Amino acid sequence: MPTPLRASPASAAPSPLPQRILVVENSRTHARLIGEAIEQKLNLPVVYAATLAEARAALERHPDWFMVVTSLVLADGSHDEVVEFFLSRQLPTVVVSGVYDDGLREQVLRRQVVDYVLKNTPGSIDYLVWLVQRLERNRRIAALVVDDSRSARQHAAALLAMYGFRVIEAADGEAGLAMLDANPDIRLAIVDQEMPGMKGHEFTRRLRARHARDHLAIIGISGTSDGSLVPRFLKSGANDFLHKPFSREEFFCRVSQNIDQLELIGTLQDLATRDFLTGLPNRRHFLAECHALLPNTLGRQQSVTAAIIDIDHFKHINDTYGHEAGDVALKAVAQAIARHAGTQDLVARFGGEEFCALVPYLGESESVDYFESLRAQIEALEVDVGGPKLRMTVSIGVFRTRFPGQTLNHLLSEADRRLYLAKAGGRNRVVSGG
């Protein structure tokens, strides 16, 4: 089942990850082709250099570097000097070359270079953009390596770290399960077959029973020649399998393919459950989540507060400022609602200019204060629509109950009735009684 979509409260944001990319290329035309594709498709800042001297100056000007894309042919450095210059600064480095040379490729990949990419070939720019995006996203993903061989485990972990993953290691299946429980952000598991206590395919079976395919990718690995092992892993729930020894490039391609598929599934789930304009959960998903929350909360005689929030005079906003401005207004209100909501609150765009919230555990006066605060925050917004700042207000109907047996339809109907009273009473107000 997909993870419930709930808005989180505003909190101290984690330190932002470095975003700046250095493109080092003696051909300024090709440098621009690479850099502009990255900027346009990924919205990441790019700085250019044509020599190691220019690269050194750029690195000294800015502290927040994410990675480097560099040619091996520079006026002031040999192949080895170029690679060493960037790796010594612990920057993820992708090398681009105009010619394919097996010896040079092997020489480069023996270092900690992320990839060796041919330029001026069909699709090379698209591949570079994909690679940069993959490395950028990997920084937010944790990966688990489960292998009883310390050297093999550390080898796989080092490769994953090179590709930007946060890596967690375990020497056997039981330790691996404990690591999964302690680190819910793990999205990838690399699992060896031969381990004491629990074979890799059995660990995979137990892992898959806890984590669905839309949450966790599992790749089995083994050096055995047993032909039955691959289907055994796959039937136990693995997404893929690699035979040892494997090349760096094959490992990265398999890992990336599986993570790409996880993200595609997540995108499709978002399309099915989120409102495309505001990013809030949509009506259908909200109702499903509410039906799950309501019996548990009211069954323990805890309170639940339902609210319907409607933008006042929204038609006037569209008619006066245009429909694009109306969309901007909807997004601004949605963002205010999402910032205000707590981790257990359910919020959604219901349709048009109407939003809905279901908030557990509020006291009677707290429920009014909660939505009065939201109303005031929205009233204080000044929305940029390309001219005079847009100001707007909302009316909110609120209904609170703690009685078991109350249906969601009843809660929403009562909240809607109070919304009507708020509109009739002059708008820009919260009505909870009546």
Give names to the regions the model predicted:
Residues 346-349, 390:
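A short pre-motif secondary-structure segment
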Residues 289-321, 337, 348, 367:
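Active-site-proximal structural segments of metal-dependent nucleotidyl cyclase/transferase enzymes
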Residues 269-270, 283-303, 334-342, 360:
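Short regulatory alpha-helical coupling segments
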Residues 358-367, 386-389, 394-411:
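Catalytic strand-loop-helix junctions within cyclic-nucleotide turnover domains
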